[in-house]
Amino acid sequence: MIYLHAIDPIAFSLGPVKVHWYGLMYLAGFGAAWCLGRQRIQAGRLLGVNIDGFSDLLFYAMMGVVLGGRVGYMLFYAFHDFLQEPLLLFRVWEGGMSFHGGLIGVLLAVAWWSRRQRMHMFDVVDFCAPLVPVGLGFGRLGNFIGGELWGKLTHNGWGVIFPRAPLSDVPAGQLAMQDVINFVQIQEHYAAGLLGHYARHPSQLYEAFLEGLVMFIVLWLFSRKPRPRYAVSGLFALLYGVFRFLVEFVRMPDNGVYVAFGWLTRGQILSLPLIVIGLFLFWLSCRSPVLQPVPAPEVAK
């Protein structure tokens, strides 16, 4: 059944401050990561680190996600706008976060924290990797609630009508449905069954399922057994790269522009290195040690 997206992206207001669902999804993701990470710490999955140490790590990882995600979006998807108006970097309430930028930010934060703790960086990355998909899933749900990052037009019965989406897939930059008629008229047309040809793939939900639920289950089960260094990180990079590359085929490209061949998107270009890195990390894991967990009472940091 075709669904008309009519969800208010604002969860509630505190005086002049409007709290968006997308921000709450970020908080839910970080909260879930803390709960799951605490469980792994108690199982001794990060040698020599206790819950206080993990809380410290998570704080810096959160900073890496937010700062890296915003800077990455400006560099990868809105560089021209950033050059025209550098202050756009700080207008986070207008939206615009990049997974690949957030990933770089997290890796930099983990590298700094690992160096300070005198730990191997990839022991920490392997520990964190199973915690990330939950946040990715919540983030994609936030994208769906916000009615952004929609998919291409579809004739499938589960399509979603996004009033903010363009009226067709090409050309880029044309008017959205809400620019032509008001929302009351949109609801009337929807009830009369006149908007079916404007339905789009709910690509945000596809990503929430693949990058969130599926990746979490696979990585969580895979990491329950001690694995060689690099193995969990490699599996994360490989799965995300493949899933993101595939979903991009039914997702509208950022800014409505394909990078090459009339079908290749910037998201696919940024995901290809992750696939290569994932395979390389698997190769490294074949010649790396397996670190056995240390029970929580024995940890010191």
Curated annotation (Swiss-Prot):
A molecular-function term among this protein's GO annotations: phosphatidylglycerol-prolipoprotein diacylglyceryl transferase activity
BP term (GO), one: lipoprotein biosynthetic process
Subcellular location: Cell inner membrane
Membrane topology: Multi-pass membrane protein
TM helices/strands, residue ranges: 10-30, 57-77, 92-112, 119-139, 202-222, 230-250, 264-284
Keyword Cell membrane: yes
Keyword DNA repair part of the UniProt annotation: no
Residues given in the record as a 1,2-diacyl-sn-glycero-3-phospho-(1'-sn-glycerol) binding sites: R140
Keywords: Cell inner membrane, Cell membrane, Membrane, Transferase, Transmembrane, Transmembrane helix
Enzyme type, top EC level: transferase
Chief site of localization: membrane
EC number per UniProt: 2.5.1.145
Pathway as given in its UniProt record: Protein modification; lipoprotein biosynthesis (diacylglyceryl transfer)
Gene Ontology, cellular component aspect: plasma membrane
Similarity comment: Belongs to the Lgt family.
NCBIfam families xref list: lgt
Role summary: Catalyzes the transfer of the diacylglyceryl group from phosphatidylglycerol to the sulfhydryl group of the N-terminal cysteine of a prolipoprotein, the first step in the formation of mature lipoproteins.
Name this protein carries in UniProt: Phosphatidylglycerol--prolipoprotein diacylglyceryl transferase
Biological source species: Xylella fastidiosa (strain Temecula1 / ATCC 700964)
